[in-house]
């Protein structure tokens, strides 16, 4: 009988234990090691061209989605800076305004990598360039275009965007345009 009471008492003590899980330090260290030895990237970083000036830019710890101090602190290797243009009118004036917006964003990204942060970040257009830049301790900027609207009716603009470093382009973004319908259903009430 004493054995049964002993077993029941032991079970009761087990049930009364603090059930908070203690973090497995070795597991956290392993995760951190993986993070530090793997190429980490953020595939969508919106930008504001007002944050790409001599006095205010992404080499500073700004209240932005990403910047160099945040990339360093979070061990982020690659930021895909986005050349986004909201959908406007499908007119010559609309295309001109959109093209100016897109060009301003391309220019801002190039100022970051060529002037303000040239010793800390560089533009990559291939995975080999990403690897090479990581090996020398630089952060990496890549460029994506959200909304093909700014290229207007001149498909040759795609090649120019490519030459400026863009490596992907979505056809539409939050609105129908000259290339594609979007999910917003402006014309078909869907």
Where in this protein do the model-derived segments appear?
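Sec-dependent N-terminal signal peptides
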Residues: 4-13
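N-terminal hydrophobic targeting/anchoring segments and the immediately downstream early-domain regions
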Residues: 16-188
């Amino acid at each position: 009988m004493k054995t049964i009471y002993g077993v029941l008492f032991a079970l009761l003590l087990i049930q009364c234990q603090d059930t908070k899980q203690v973090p497995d330090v070795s597991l956290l260290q392993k995760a951190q090691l993986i993070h530090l030895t793997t190429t980490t990237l953020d595939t969508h970083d919106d930008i504001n061209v007002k944050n790409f000036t001599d006095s205010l830019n992404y080499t500073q710890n700004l209240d932005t989605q990403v910047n160099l101090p945040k990339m360093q602190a979070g061990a982020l290797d690659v930021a895909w800076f986005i050349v986004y243009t909201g959908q406007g009118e499908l007119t010559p004036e609309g295309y001109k305004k959109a093209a100016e917006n897109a060009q301003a964003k391309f220019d801002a990204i190039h100022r970051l990598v060529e002037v303000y942060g040239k010793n800390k970040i560089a533009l990559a257009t291939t995975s080999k360039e990403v690897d090479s830049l990581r090996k020398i301790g630089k952060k990496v900027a890549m460029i994506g275009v959200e909304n093909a609207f700014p290229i207007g009716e001149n498909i040759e603009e795609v090649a120019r965007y490519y030459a400026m470093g863009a490596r992907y382009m979505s056809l539409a973004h939050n609105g129908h345009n000259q290339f594609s319908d979007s999910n917003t259903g402006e014309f078909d009430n869907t």
